[in-house]
């Protein structure tokens, strides 16, 4: 279990004080994958660097498996960092060392005998799919291969927690998916708790059990990924979800012909089993209404499917629409009115 209690981080500059992280509270279950998303400058990278005390909080507590990180001695912190490992956006490999020696490096620091360190490193290199590349140097590797080395190195001391700071941001889409699949694989095999930082909502959708959304140093929304996608509350969250679902219909609303007074354009958001239910058939039969489909999409998450449907109902009374909306809510379908005549 990871607990963050009222975490604050201030930077003092010559001209002003900067509040990078503003009273953040988080509870992260052991064995889960927890995502933190936000735009540049939201404070997410500063936050994750406090998990292993690369940055010290100005105030507040970070407790990992019962240990208050800020209260550990230097020797205790070194040992704790072996169990709270990290991978980075730009890999942070040692360019003068080949793949094998990059992976053995943390084992050398931990005092592991060279024979055992080499054996462990070779196992990890095979695990991340780089068998045969042990003698290659970082300059000879692709971005995805470099990140695989970073993952192998991070796993060298059998960590309990893996921190991922924008680990796929420098990669192309296909390589990103390969790295995400690898992280899911190692998490399953080694029962890791993964905390990842990203500005890409599809990474959250594919990987995470829960997500926290940050803006201006604060957590503005938090919850299970499926719930946040189904019913985002904050405007920043809505923007992330909209971009990931390729839902740009609202931008086109102003170009539509004026609606009749009893017409509606609505978005239906649904998750899980609802994505395969015959919603349109249900609406037309149960409510005896005509429906035009304007836009639709379905995405897969780690724990199921989610999607949206934008429809035009050309004629429906206000009272009938209230009943229609209520019935869909009973089926766990969220209804959002985009335009009314």
UniProtKB/Swiss-Prot annotation:
Is the Lyase keyword given for this protein?
A: no
Q: Which UniProt keywords apply?
A: Amino-acid transport, ATP-binding, Cell membrane, Membrane, Nucleotide-binding, Translocase, Transport
Q: Into which EC class is this enzyme placed?
A: translocase
Q: Where in the cell is it found?
A: Cell membrane
- Give the primary localization class: membrane
Gene3D superfamilies for the chain: 3.30.70.260, P-loop containing nucleotide triphosphate hydrolases
> Which Gene Ontology CC terms are recorded?
plasma membrane
Residue positions binding ATP = 38-45
| Domain called ABC transporter: residue spans | 2-241
Partners and quaternary state?
A: The complex is composed of two ATP-binding proteins (MetN), two transmembrane proteins (MetI) and a solute-binding protein (MetQ).
Q: What is this protein called?
A: Methionine import ATP-binding protein MetN 1
Species this protein is from: Staphylococcus epidermidis (strain ATCC 12228 / FDA PCI 1200)
